[in-house]
Amino acid sequence: MILAIQLFYFGVSDPWLDFVVPSIQFSMELCSEAPHYDNDWPSDITVWVNGLEIGTWTSPGDFGGRRGKLNPAWWPDLSTQFGSLKTWRVDETRSTLDDVEVSTTTLQQLSLLSNSFIGMRIGVKENARFKGGLNLFGKRFGDHEQDMVMRIYYML
């Protein structure tokens, strides 16, 4: 069961809350980066969490040719317009990209509960096959009305 707690209060007899984290997820709209735009401009975009690689997506291009649904009027037509909405997820057994396994990195390996922060990095590796850069869209650009989102799923 996944709970979205809006308010939780503690009394003297129960001064803490125990929870289990079964997965963590990162969702974002992104694409390659080329001069102006180029729909055929692949880029190997990798995500790391706490220094561990969780998976790479090969973006097929830097998308243009039509306006992004959310782009402001002042944004030039010949620039990057939109991306693809991608979701990386790490659970107790594997890492996935859009529900397809991309690595064997697990939640336990990320040491989420023993660190004072969660470090997330997105980029293109120096030794990537396709080094086409990247565009990362917020909720007012592209086609998907969302900023980059990190979700930590938990169970009580």
Residue ranges and their predicted role:
Residues M1, P60-L113, R129-G132:
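Extended, solvent-exposed segments with strong compositional bias
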Residues V20-N39:
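A short beta-strand element within beta-rich, extracytoplasmic domains
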Residues I24-F26, L107-Q109, S114-N127:
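Short, well-structured beta-strand segments within conserved domains
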Residues Y37-V49:
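Short coil-to-beta strand junction motifs in C2/discoidin
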Residues G51-W57:
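Surface-exposed loop/edge segments in extracytoplasmic proteins
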Residues G123-L156:
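Proprotein-processing/basic-patch segments
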